[in-house]
Amino acid sequence: MARYRRCRSQSRSRCCRPRRRCRRRRRSCRARRRATRCCRRRYRLRCRRY
């Protein structure tokens, strides 16, 4: 959970990290898109799902 706490200081895009499966397919992965949206809109400990 410490990874998401860095979201306040670091960039919003690094706040949410995609699932392990999404790392292989970055472009076609839907989970990564949802994670980035979560960071941009609500980037305060709201990204625990991803």
From Swiss-Prot:
GO terms for molecular function: DNA binding. Protamines substitute for histones in the chromatin of sperm during the haploid phase of spermatogenesis. They compact sperm DNA into a highly condensed, stable and inactive complex. It is found in: Nucleus; Chromosome. Testis. Pfam families: Protamine_P1. One of its GO terms (cellular component) is nucleus. It comes from Trachypithecus vetulus. One of its GO terms (biological process) is sperm DNA condensation. Keywords: Chromosome, Developmental protein, Differentiation, DNA condensation, DNA-binding, Nucleosome core, Nucleus, Spermatogenesis. Transmembrane segments: none annotated. Belongs to the protamine P1 family. This is Sperm protamine P1.
